[in-house]
């Protein structure tokens, strides 16, 4: 009896994490994991790197036509890196447009994620910044190179395990 109660409690908790987008992705048989809602009520989903392209295309077809932001962060020293996508459904009569947040976690030893540049052009500079600061390689990105740091810079400055060089070479800005 206790096992049945534990299973039903887990199902209730899992259903509390699912929103409209998660239910729609389940209907479309697209792999993801619901992570719940943030403090503003935005649904958050985890997607594996190998499933990102199919999920992103489906979300674009569903109406998420605007990539509001893409960012990255270092989960923990020596741990995974995360790439985060904030998508918005922009249409003519939306006072409160629907939003969704997609998180992709990759190991720091092989941080490769497919680029969404071909779906949302606004990913161009944002993916480049994530590459420059964290070393996440966005496979298929047409201009993936450093955007903030000099081309010859060694390392990824926003990683938690980054060791700051002893000196910096000052360069002219022109």
Curated annotation (Swiss-Prot):
Gene Ontology CC annotations of this record: chloroplast thylakoid membrane
Family the UniProt entry places it in: Belongs to the complex I 30 kDa subunit family.
Keyword Zinc-finger: no
Domain of life: Eukaryota
A single GO BP: photosynthesis, light reaction
S-S bonds: none
Gene3D superfamilies: NADH:ubiquinone oxidoreductase, 30kDa subunit (3.30.460.80)
Keyword check for Thylakoid: yes
Stored HAMAP family: NDH1_NuoC
Matching PROSITE patterns: COMPLEX1_30K (PS00542)
Sorted UniProt keywords: Chloroplast, Membrane, NAD, NADP, Plastid, Plastoquinone, Quinone, Thylakoid, Translocase, Transport
E.C. numbers: 7.1.1.-
Record's bilayer topology term: Peripheral membrane protein
Subcellular location: Plastid, Chloroplast thylakoid membrane
Catalyses which reaction(s): a plastoquinone + NADH + (n+1) H(+)(in) = a plastoquinol + NAD(+) + n H(+)(out); a plastoquinone + NADPH + (n+1) H(+)(in) = a plastoquinol + NADP(+) + n H(+)(out)
General function of this protein: NDH shuttles electrons from NAD(P)H:plastoquinone, via FMN and iron-sulfur (Fe-S) centers, to quinones in the photosynthetic chain and possibly in a chloroplast respiratory chain. The immediate electron acceptor for the enzyme in this species is believed to be plastoquinone. Couples the redox reaction to proton translocation, and thus conserves the redox energy in a proton gradient.
Assembly: NDH is composed of at least 16 different subunits, 5 of which are encoded in the nucleus.
Predominant subcellular localization, coarse grouping: plastid
Organism, as annotated: Mesostigma viride (Green alga)
Name of the protein in question: NAD(P)H-quinone oxidoreductase subunit J, chloroplastic
Pfam families with a match to the protein in the record: Complex1_30kDa
GO MF annotation, one: NADH dehydrogenase (ubiquinone) activity
Gene designation: ndhJ
């Amino acid at each position: 009896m206790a096992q049945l109660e534990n299973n039903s409690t887990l199902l209730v908790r899992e259903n509390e994490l699912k929103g409209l987008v998660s239910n729609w992705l389940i209907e479309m048989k697209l792999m993801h994991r619901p992570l719940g809602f943030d403090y503003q009520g935005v649904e958050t989903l985890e997607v594996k790197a190998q499933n990102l392209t199919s999920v992103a295309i489906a979300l674009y077809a569903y109406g998420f036509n605007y990539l509001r932001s893409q960012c990255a962060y270092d989960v923990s020293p020596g741990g995974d890196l995360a790439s985060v996508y904030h998508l918005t459904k922009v249409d003519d009569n939306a006072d409160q447009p629907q939003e969704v947040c997609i998180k992709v976690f990759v190991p720091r030893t092989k941080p490769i994620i497919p680029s969404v540049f071909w779906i949302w052009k606004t990913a161009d500079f944002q993916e480049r910044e994530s590459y420059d600061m964290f070393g996440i390689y966005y496979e298929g990105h047409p201009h993936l190179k450093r955007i903030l740091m000099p081309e010859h810079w060694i390392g990824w400055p926003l990683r938690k395990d980054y060791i700051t060089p002893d000196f910096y070479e000052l360069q002219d800005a022109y």
